[in-house]
Amino acid sequence: MFLIGTALSLLFNSCSKDPVIPENETDNKLHEDPSKMTIRLVECHLHADWNEIQKVGGPHQNPESPAKHMKRIQEITYELKAGKGWRLAEGSQSKFYVQKNGDYYTYGKYTPAPVYLMFIYYYNAKGDLMNSQFIENGQDNIHQHFFTPENVKPTFDGQPEADDNEPQKLVDYLYVDTTPWDKTKHSKEAEITGDSNPIGLKGVIRFLKDRKEFDLKIRLYHGYKSKGNPETGTFDPFYKPSGILIQRGTWDINLNIPVVVFWSREETVG
């Protein structure tokens, strides 16, 4: 009996040291899956150099315009429908109408205008805001939004160009996420941390070509262990997640948002 007991003890001790099979991250996320997503664009001008925004802030909202397609605040909302996937919410506008920025300098500072603050809000099935779930409990270390223009074509009065399919020639984007995530630097209650920890719940975007239509592919990356690129030791650019990053994670969100860049700011300044 002693030998049998010893054998069983060794058997169970051996089993307890077997390699632990990692959980499937797609089935065991530490956050809910969103059921609604709202993207808000706020047209702004700058009180700081574009290249300093991630340190000091600077975008200020422009006053409202009576023009139909020149709303200073625009929102697009998608909802997850059973059996249908993501669908445009009832009553939501379907496209963003924006302007190509003009290149301006103020007291030696590069202050292109307009630029657009872009906020993303996620809601769970109960309708509760759930942005914090992508931040808390270390989730900020494995989540990052990517923004990639696709399906580019000229508007009715535009012309195709050779570099239309180069994302960085169409848009420029800066991560301006804050810590805490739901406070602002302007209120002196938060610091901008988007450069050192890009998430993309808050950002500022500008459009570099006029008379273009495209889909802005918005993807929320969920890394299995990290969102950093192990080959470069840095974060991938906003428009291009690397192949190795894609292999080491999944997408929490993958949606196309239609954008129309109907004219240039310089055409409206006389």
What are these regions (language model features)?
Residues 9-39:
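Bacterial Sec-dependent N-terminal signal peptides
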Residues 38-80:
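Post-signal-peptide N-terminal segment of Sec-exported extracytoplasmic proteins
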Residues 57-66, 231-270:
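Short beta-strand elements
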Residues 102-116, 134, 181-217, 222-232, ...:
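Exposed beta-sheet edge/beta-hairpin loop segments within beta-rich domains
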